[in-house]
Amino acid sequence: MLVPQTLHRLLGLGHQQRPRYHAKQPLPYDVVVVDEASMLDLQLATLLFEAIPANCRLILLGDAKQLASVDVGAVLADLQQVPALKHNHVQLVTSRRFNAEAKIGQFAGFIQHLSDVKPAEDILAAFEQQVASAQTLQSIQLHDNMSDLVQLEYLNDSLLHEPTAYYLQLMQGYVPYVNALKQYREQAASIDLAKVIQAFDDYRILVAIRFGKFGLDQINRFAEDWLTTQLMVVPVAGWYLGRPVMMTYNDYQLGLSNGDIGICFRHRTQSDQFEVYFPSLDKWVAANRLPKNIQTAFALTIHKSQGSEFKHTAIVFDASAEKILSQELIYTAITRAKNIVSLLVDRAAFLQSLTQRTARKSGLVKKLIMISF
C-alpha cells in the first residue's frame, strides 16, 4: 500500500536542511505525485526538481486559484504560464467534489469568474442574491438534512465590543463533538475512536489572522474554555480530554510534521496521564513529549487549512483582517467544505476579499521562458 508523506520526508530534509536526495543521489521512483501543489514554494520546489531522476514522471496536482505558499513563489501558477509546458498542463473542468448546481460549487465558480470591471457593490449584491442564504446564523450545527448550504451573516458593529454571542454561535458546530466525547468518556471500552475523530473532523472554524477578537488565538481560547466547561473537566498542564492540537514545525524525533493534527485522550494504560492520537499517522504520542507551546486547533488559519476537507466550515473575520484578504484566501477557505459554508464576516472586509487578488512575481516564468527557447 502506498503511504503518503510530506515533501520534507520524501526528500529526507532534516534539521540541517540538507536533503538526503538531490541531483547526485536522486529519488528511487518512477512516478512522484505531489498533491496540493499550489503550496509549493520556490526553495522546496527547487529541491524537489533537483531530486527527480531523468526517467521519473513528476505529477503536480493542485489549484492555482488557491493560496500560494507563505514563502517565496507561486510555482504551480507560474508553471502554467510557460508556453513550452502548455501540453503538459491539464485542467479539470468538472468538479468531483460538488456539482455545478451545489451552493459551494456556485460560490467557488462565482469567485473564479469575478470581473475586475464590475462595480464592487454589484458583485456583493450578486453574491447575496445568487449564492448565499442571507440569514442570521441561529445555529450552525451540522444537520443531516442540510447538505448544500452557504450561510451569510454580517458582523454587527454594535455587538463587537462584546463578541461572546458570536463565539457561542461558532461553538455550535462542535456540539456533536462534545456529545461524542461524553459518550467516549462513559463507555471508552465500547466506543469506536473513529467516531470521535469523525465528529471533530466534520467541522472547523477558519480564520484569516492570528490576533484580534476574531483571530486564531482568541477563538481557540474561547473554544477551550467552552469545551472544558461542557465536559466539566479541568486542564492538567494544559491538557484535557478532547483537546485538538496541531504541530507547527517538523519534529523528526517524534516523527511529526508541520500541520499534523491530533486529539488528546486519557492514556490507555495510565489513567492519570494523557496521550495524543494523530489519525493521519495512526500514531499515539504521550502528551508530555509534545512541545508545551503546541497550538490548540479548534480554529485554523485559512493558510494552515490547505489540504484539509471538512463537511462544514465556518469562516470568520472582521475589519482587522482587511490587509491580507483576497480572492485566493476566500476561495481556499470555501473549498475546504464539502457540504456547508457559514460566513460570519465584516461586510466591507468581505467585499474586499471578493475584489482583491494577490500578485506575486518570483521571476520564475521569465527564466523558464528564456531557457525553453
Question: PLM ranges: what are they?
Answer:
Residues 1-28, 300:
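Inter-Walker segment of RecA-like/P-loop motor cores
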Residues 65, 69-245, 251-253:
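Conserved helicase motor core of P-loop NTPases
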Residues 16-30, 40-56, 200:
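Short basic/glycine-enriched coil/helix segment immediately N-terminal to the Walker B
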Residues 8, 38-39, 46, 65-66:
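Catalytic acidic motif of RecA-like/P-loop NTPases
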Residues 53, 238-241, 257, 305, ...:
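Residue-level recognition of short, solvent-exposed, well-ordered loop/turn junctions
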Residues 29, 54-57, 85-90, 201, ...:
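Short glycine-/polar-rich loops that comprise or flank the Walker A/P-loop
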Residues 35-36, 62:
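Walker B catalytic acidic pair
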Residues 260-373:
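C-terminal accessory regions
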